[in-house]
Amino acid sequence: MMNMKTAFVTGATGLLGNNLVRELIAKGCRVKALVRSLEKGRRQFGSVEGVELIAGDMTDVAAFASHLQGCDVLFHTAAYFRDNYKGGSHWPELKAINVDGTERLLEQAYRAGIRRFVHTSSIAVLNGEPGMPIDETCLRRSEDADDYYRSKILADEVVLAFLQSHPDMNGSLVLPGWMWGPADLGPTSSSQLANDVMNGKLPGLVPGSFSVVDARDVALAMILAAERGKRAERYLAAGRHMTMQQLVPLLGKIAGVQTPKRTLPLPLLYIIAALQEAYARLSGKPILLSLATVRLMVKEANRSHFNHAKSERELGLTFRPVEQTIGDTVAWLRNNAAES
């Protein structure tokens, strides 16, 4: 087992990042947590001991690089992902943060003496035939990718190129699915969906399938990858294949609310998405359905069966029941709503 006395975590207030910080603290590790907002960092980690908040942004890695000194391992979870979430095109931000920011972070970590890192990749870098199991070897071509997917593919290429040119640096890549779980201050699309279901705002079911995973299980996968992962290897942490027709009724049952039964036709989904994007532009608020999301659902339908044999064999990774994940997500959202 490697020495992990002090870890540096980017994206620390995010759904994955904050759960990773908590898991590291529970294992006796000190954590330097990169946050864009100290206020949000204090809100997320107010009562957690062993966390040092570092204010910084992935668009200016040099500004926080001195804090990488003295760390044993780097966990990179920060990413810009709103291309599929807020609507519109965000390629400059996607490239600046997900691609260029990753490269600069690795360069600064190496200069600071860090020789072990775990990079958060995505199932977006993989592709396969509908209904067939997809593993870490099923790589997606960048020309078969939207802007967000392309940014994750290019980020992986940056990571692997860095490892090739720095033979004394060790790094692994973890590929999460659609993450759910508690402490989602964002909120990300999973908590947005849960809130919409609980508040009766979901007009109907959408077609398509997803791979649902607990952010806490992904956090454990990151730690296991740091401890046991092989150099320059990808490890899936995608979770369980589910259709929206399975997920929403389960969410309703656990939350104790009625859920829609009908599946919305695709032409209507495109109209709703266009209207939501217009609303997002006017209000600046996140939306559940963007045009990019609808296109993605159509393109990726039934391409969410992932084979975790490698992660199970080499990392010892397991997943908690999806019912527990949804239950904990709902409970946290309700408690958080009551407090705010």
Locate the predicted segments by residue:
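N-terminal Rossmann NAD(P)H-binding glycine-rich loop of SDR-like oxidoreductase domains
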Residues: 5-27
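NAD(P)H-binding glycine-rich loop region in Rossmannoid oxidoreductase-like domains
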Residues: 47-100, 108
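Conserved Rossmann-fold NAD(P)-dependent oxidoreductase catalytic core, especially the SDR/UDP-sugar
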Residues: 96-148
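Substrate-positioning beta->alpha
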Residues: 104, 189, 206-227, 233
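Glycine-rich "substrate-gating" loop/helix at the edge of Rossmann-like oxidoreductase active sites
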Residues: 145-146, 177-186, 203-216
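Active-site Tyr-X1-5-Lys
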Residues: 145-172
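Glycine/proline-rich active-site loop of Rossmann-fold NAD(P)-dependent oxidoreductases
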Residues: 167-169, 181-192, 225-235, 257-259
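Mid/C-terminal beta-alpha module of Rossmann-like enzyme folds, strongest
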Residues: 221-289, 308, 313-314, 323-340
